[in-house]
Amino acid sequence: MDRKENITPNTLEIQKNDEIEGTFCHELFENSFFNEKLCQELLVELPNINKTASSTRIIKWIISNVDTCFTSHHDDNDLYQIKNYSKKIEDKWKEYRQILEKYT
């Protein structure tokens, strides 16, 4: 059996539901914490996810919302702050973003 068939299509859907604790999106959107380990775990799963219109939409949604978090963090008029922000984390996100974009 192909490994892609073993991976539930819910892998990305779980990320999209930012109320599910223990996901990269939940940590960043709800807890304002960029969890690099959870982001890396998501990236590792990408090759195992069938490319569909839905998966492409969700990946674009993740990219857009993470970008918004960084934009909000830098906006003096916005109360949202990434608790563990550093230039290094933002630079890492730019690398991770390029990987995600390959799957859209």
Kindly give the residue locations of the regions a language model identified.
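Short terminal alpha-helical segments
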Residues: 1-43
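Alpha-helical rod/repeat scaffolding segments in eukaryotic adaptors/tethers
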Residues: 25-32, 52, 79-82, 86
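Residue-level signal for well-ordered alpha-helical scaffold segments within enzymatic catalytic domains
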Residues: 27, 48, 98-102
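Amphipathic, non-membrane alpha-helical segments in soluble helical-bundle scaffolds
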Residues: 32-40, 53-60, 86
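Residue-level detector of alpha-helical secondary structure
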Residues: 43, 47-50, 90, 97
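Short hydrophobic interaction/assembly module
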Residues: 48-72
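Amphipathic alpha-helical binding modules
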Residues: 63-104
